[in-house]
Design a protein with these regions (language model features):
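A flexible loop/linker signature enriched in serine peptidases of the S9 family
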Residues: 62-69, 89-90, 117-118, 132-143, ...
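Short loop/turn segments that connect beta-strands within beta-propeller blades
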Residues: 75-76, 146-149, 229-232, 279-282, ...
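Serine-hydrolase catalytic core recognition
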Residues: 257, 263, 395-709
Length: 709
């Protein structure tokens, strides 16, 4: 009898513990957190830090126990003034208050980011000496003397047609003797159509049409040409070095007006060239050529042309790490590698020709620190005397004054509040501590920091870094299902590295009774090109072997983590990846919420997918398609799509739904009227919460209208 009572009480305790997660109280708490966990409850945290132009005075806003303050400080004297309003601050600084943003009514007259500029503007372009104007009229180049009637014009070309016309992107040489443009061959465009079912200003639906090139589509072709404005002579470039274009751009005249420098990105992204064309002969030669068996990561490139255009700084991953190189333009050869090592340059802040120095940010320099933490550096152009200007451990954000003498450095970690310091922009020496963030009020509200966690990846050597978010009422005696937030790109690293008072992807969801995690597996950026190019023609990988090992390692350390009960969610590329999780890794991931996913890379935008999946479109696209793999679904799946998604074609989601239905698979489909590219907005968040509570906690969620939101 005694044993039976013990057994019954144990079962009751387990049942009560399970029911405690996903309850109405949990929902109410989850929805309340964004109002409590925010920067209003963080004191001494400078925001919107700026230096006044051409001065050593910097200014910022911060919350204090007495309310919001607007502060101006002099870096030379450390003198400080505090104000109660932005108007008072700007009056003291004698700078104009920024104008309020004008309301936007609709998008009808804006160029959509997917639209290709046809380069047909008819506005005249004036020569540097102010004497002549060049413009396009009837697909041809026309010259006009400033001050004279436009009826008095000189036609420089006559062979322009609708199918092969001269571009209006005209550039004058510095000496005003030449003009450069391109002959442009347009192509037939692809369009995506979608219906706005519930427009705000009318009853009937609206059909939208959007230009949208997809992988494999034909692209425009451009050929540079240069006109001598004195003789009217035209020279046209030979296309041999740029005959398979994805893009041809970044045209710049040399300072001596003898050449035009431009960049060629080959279709398929395995060759990238910086070229130059002679104004006299039209001859094209190569300054820089990058090649890769996988892809040249062109969005990461940086080019700096020296004032006399004799030298050029170029950023490249040619040695596996993202670094800077000095090139001799005339010889087309590397003078020296400026930065080197098993770390990555992240961004160029300034190239100072006068000081012969470069200011930049980088990650991975410090071997004993999180390799994603960003620090700021100064280095000589000869690659010597590299100095860290922001040495404290953490992820840094730096603001420099006009002459780089001072840097305001704010740094933090995902689990550590920010510190803001004033340092020397010359040697990084500490000048003063501006502020140390006070999060005591945040903690009084129950705030719980995420844990930074690392585990070995699939190779058994490489550390995979991520975060673990626990609920505010965390109880280590309970068992917690795991939910992973995924966005694996590629193209960047996505796990937060700086302090965040409220993480929209993890905080509220954890409060329902979950452990929520995020990590960057192989195939993402800033750990070297070999680490990233695992994604090539293989987006279905998405780092899943590393992710599973990471979660299992966390569960091995923390017994309350249930690695046998794992869900996953994401949007956009993360929507594709979360769907892939339950199609190809359904033995590990039991439930997936997938919003606005590019579920088949053949359906998505051309630039993103051809960069990672290559060109021409081949079998790898099919192998990575969630439409093709839909019949492999295991576990629960919720598909979410905004009917007006102008980033990822909504049909991508509908085609997965169609394939799942034909395969006899059960799933949920949520269509959001009037919504663009999204994680789901308020209704989607509600559906996501309920979906995981039902499928991982195995309890019935409270009614939505009973929750205090």
């Amino acid at each position: 009898m005694k044993m039976r009572l013990i057994l019954l009480s144990t079962l009751f305790a387990v049942s009560a513990g399970a029911m405690a997660q996903g309850s109405l109280a949990d929902y109410n708490r989850a929805y309340s957190l964004s109002n409590k966990f925010n920067n209003d409850n963080v004191y001494n945290l400078p925001a919107d830090i700026k230096f006044k132009d051409s001065t050593n005075t910097y200014y910022y806003t911060e919350n204090t126990a007495a309310g919001k303050k607007y502060v101006a400080k002099n870096a030379d004297t450390n003198g400080s003034k505090s104000f109660d309003s932005k108007e008072e601050l700007y009056k003291y600084l004698d700078i104009k208050l920024p104008e309020a943003a004008k309301p936007q009514f609709g998008r009808k007259h804006e160029r959509h980011w997917m639209e290709i500029d046809e380069e047909k503007d008819t506005h005249p372009v004036t020569s540097p000496d102010g004497k002549l104007e060049a413009y396009i009229e009837g697909e041809n180049v026309v010259l006009h003397e400033v001050g004279k009637p436009y009826t008095e014009k000189r036609i420089l070309s006559t062979d322009g047609t609708l199918s092969n016309y001269y571009s209006a992107w005209i550039q004058w040489s510095p000496d005003s003797k030449y003009i450069m443009t391109c002959k442009r061959r347009p192509v037939e465009k692809r369009y995506v159509y979608y219906v706005e079912s519930s427009p705000a200003d009318q009853l009937q639906p609206i059909l939208h049409k959007q230009e949208y090139a997809k992988p494999g589509d034909e692209l425009p072709f451009k050929v540079p040409c240069i006109f001598d404005v004195t003789t009217g002579k035209e020279v046209i470039a030979s296309t041999q070095l740029f005959d398979n274009q994805f893009s041809l751009d970044a045209f710049t005249w040399s300072s001596d007006s003898k050449e035009v420098i431009f960049e060629y990105n080959e279709r398929g992204h395995k060759i990238y060239r910086v070229l130059t064309m002679s104004a006299q002969t039209g001859k094209v030669r190569t300054i820089i050529e990058e090649t890769a068996a996988t892809f040249v990561n062109y969005p990461r490139h940086f080019r700096y042309d020296f004032a006399d255009t004799s030298k050029m700084i170029w950023m490249s991953e040619c040695d596996n790490w993202n670094h800077l190189y000095m090139y001799n333009v005339a010889k087309g050869k590397v003078i020296n590698q400026i930065t080197k090592g098993t770390w990555c340059v992240r961004e160029i802040v300034k190239v100072d020709e006068k000081a012969n120095a470069i200011y930049f940010s980088a990650s991975g320099v410090n071997p004993n620190e999180d390799p994603y933490h960003i620090h700021y550096y100064r280095i000589g152009m000869d690659g010597k005397n590299m100095i860290c200007l922001t040495p404290a451990e953490g992820n840094h954000q730096a603001v420099f004054n006009y002459d780089m003498k001072y840097v305001v450095d704010k740094y933090s970690k995902a689990d550590t509040p920010p510190v803001t310091e004033l340092r020397s922009g010359i040697d990084g020496k500490m000048i003063s501590t501006i502020a140390k963030a006070d999060i005591s009020k945040l903690k009084e509200c129950g705030w719980v920091a995420p844990e930074i966690f690392k585990a070995k990846g699939r190779d058994g050597v490489t550390d995979i870094w991520g975060i673990i978010q626990r609920p505010t009422n965390f109880d280590p005696t309970k068992k917690y299902p795991v939910i992973e937030y995924i966005y694996a790109g590629p193209g960047d690293a996505y796990t937060p590295k700086s302090f965040i008072a409220y993480n929209w992807n993890t905080t509220a969801l954890a409060e329902l009774g979950f452990i929520v995690v995020q990590m960057d597996g192989m195939g993402t950026a800033w750990r070297g090109k070999k680490f990233e190019e695992l994604c090539y023609k293989n987006l279905k990988d998405a780092g899943f072997p590393d992710r599973e090992l990471w979660i299992k390692a966390a569960a091995a350390k923390y017994p309350y983590i249930d690695a046998n009960n794992v869900g996953i969610f994401g949007a956009s590329a993360g929507g594709q990846e979360s769907t892939t999780a339950v199609l190809l890794h359904g033995d590990f991931y039991k439930a997936a919420y997938s919003s606005c996913g590019c579920q088949d890379n053949r359906m998505d935008k051309i630039w993103w997918n051809e960069l990672w999946m290559g060109y021409p479109v081949d079998k790898s696209y099919e192998e990575c398609s969630n439409v093709v793999n839909a019949h492999k679904l295991q576990g629960a799946l919720m598909l979410v799509v905004g009917e007006l998604d102008d980033n990822v074609d909504p049909s991508s989601t509908f085609q997965v739904a169609n394939a799942l239905e034909k395969a006899g698979k059960d799933f949920e489909l949520v269509v959001l009227p009037g919504v663009h590219h999204t994680m789901g907005e308020k209704f989607g968040e509600h559906k996501r919460f309920d979906f995981f509570v039902k499928n991982l906690l195995k309890v019935t969620p409270p009614k939505w209208n009973e929750i205090t939101k």
